[in-house]
Regions:
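Ordered, amphipathic secondary-structure segments that act as subunit-interaction surfaces
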Residues: 67-116
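Short membrane-interface loop/juxtamembrane segments of multi-pass integral membrane proteins
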Residues: 150-166
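Select subsegments of transmembrane alpha-helices in polytopic membrane proteins
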Residues: 6-7, 53-55, 64-66, 85-95, ...
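Active-site and channel-lining beta-strand-loop segments
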Residues: 22-52, 146-155
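Alpha-helical transmembrane segments and their helix-start/interface "positive-inside/aromatic belt" motifs
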Residues: 1-12
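Membrane-water interface of transmembrane alpha-helices
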Residues: 23-28, 60-72, 132-148, 211-217
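Alpha-helical transmembrane segments
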Residues: 10, 44-59, 116-133, 199-200
């Protein structure tokens, strides 16, 4: 699909999403839930005007993707992995649009307070996203925006390919950890879940960075 066509299709999705927000906006109470803990319990509230900001995030995300692609110093390489980039844009935009409805679903009683459904939806959704991106990461070509962008990978094509391949494996593992956390978050509690989450994401990121450096110094054959 041509990128311009995809951009306008997603723009329509974002506009319809915002229009639906405006339709339900008068029915919302003055204070709405805005944050949930790992257990699924609401632990943050804000004025209902907050939901309008949430509704705008998908469109802002879409615009950022379009701008980033054009200003990247290696923007010509985006054509070489266009399908992967388009998939990323679609997944992020649609996911942000879906997550933006959590406050409304909670207000209208579609998200039970006693369940960890929000944790499953958010953490699980991000986990699936990581797994999908991990499978496609080896196809990403050198750029300054998308993929595992270490200094050594950006300066060497071979290092970039090796780093993206390892990054793909690592993202899949991190995605699996997030999927497990999605269903165990309610049992572990907010603090323990956050610790495991940070350990997985930061640890995975550190390993990718270290691996790229080891390839650079010739330690990884």
């Amino acid at each position: 699909m041509k990128k311009n066509k995809l951009f306008w299709i997603l723009t329509v999705v974002c506009v319809l999403n915002f229009a639906a927000y405006l339709y339900f906006y008068p029915s919302l109470p003055d204070i709405v839930p805005t944050h949930w803990g790992a257990s699924g319990q609401v632990n943050g509230w804000g004025p209902k005007s907050t939901v309008l900001f949430l509704a705008a995030i998908p469109f802002v995300t879409l615009i950022l993707f379009e701008v980033i692609r054009k200003i990247d110093p290696k923007h010509q390489n985006f054509e070489k992995f266009g399908k992967v980039w388009n998939l990323c844009v679609v997944l992020f935009t649609v996911m942000m649009a879906a997550f933006s409805w959590l406050s409304e679903l909670a207000v209208f009683g579609k998200l039970p307070d006693s369940s960890n459904l929000v944790s499953i939806l958010v953490c699980g959704g991000i986990g699936v996203l990581f797994i999908i991106l991990g499978n496609f990461m080896p196809q990403i070509k050198q750029n300054y925006t998308f993929g595992c962008r270490t200094p050594w990978a950006l300066n060497d094509e071979h290092n970039w390919q090796r780093t993206q391949r390892m990054g793909g494996y690592t993202f899949v593992v991190m995605g699996i950890v997030l999927l497990v956390l999605a269903f165990l978050g309610g049992l572990l509690g907010d603090i323990a879940t956050l610790i495991v989450l940070l350990a997985a994401v930061l640890g995975g990121s550190a390993w990718i960075y270290l691996y790229s450096y080891l390839v650079y110094v010739g330690k990884m054959k």
